[in-house]
Amino acid sequence: MRNIQIALTKGRLEKHVIPLFEQIGIDCSELKNKGRKLVFQSKNTNVSFILVKAVDVATYVEHGVADIGIVGKDILMENEKDIYEMLDLGVGICKFCVASIPTYNPKSYRKKRIATKYPHITSTYFHDKGEDVEIIKIEGSVEIAPLLGLADAIVDIVETGKTLQENGLIVFEEMYFISARMIVNKAALKTKKDEIFSIINMMEQEILSGK
């Protein structure tokens, strides 16, 4: 059996997907007790894991460093990569929203300024609506932008809405629902077809049985 390398991202998504891998028989004990390590070998299978930043998962898969990647749909929507999107894992579910202070008027004809970490997704959404907006890209916390007058509204990922509420913002539009996806390197799907599809099929069955 050829080794399969899987790229994961640290944090919330990692905690969601580790149980899925364990349920299909892939040992994740090293991954759960990782310390500062970034590369891990499953003890009972031909699978190894690498931990990288969320925005880099698809890059590692695209360039063949990883055969499989687990990444949020938001990353795939914002950054076009030459990979196969194989499976919706049904975890890490949240949504893209337009949010602002309560006095914001989404129906105003004035050109709006929208602050976001996701300029491509945001521009596409408003273009499809026929609205001309100015996109202001922000890397940090976007919630502050409407409060300080930098932007009329923000586009961001919302899970519980608690952060918005704490900053006095409300949701005006729900744009897209997103979740964790399994992606695969195109060349690896040919050279390691049996190994990759074995993981995909077991994962799919586990997801369906859990619904």
UniProtKB/Swiss-Prot annotation:
**In what pathway does it function?**
Amino-acid biosynthesis; L-histidine biosynthesis; L-histidine from 5-phospho-alpha-D-ribose 1-diphosphate: step 1/9
Query: InterPro entries recorded for this chain?
Result: ATP_PRibTrfase_cat (IPR013820), ATP_PRibTrfase_CS (IPR018198), ATP_PRibTrfase_HisG (IPR001348), ATP_PRibTrfase_HisG_short (IPR024893)
EC top class, as a word:
transferase
Give the UniProt entry's GO cellular component terms: cytoplasm
Q: Which domain of life is it from?
A: Bacteria
Disulfide-bonded cysteines = none
Its recorded reaction(s) are: 1-(5-phospho-beta-D-ribosyl)-ATP + diphosphate = 5-phospho-alpha-D-ribose 1-diphosphate + ATP
GO biological processes: L-histidine biosynthetic process
UniProt protein name: ATP phosphoribosyltransferase
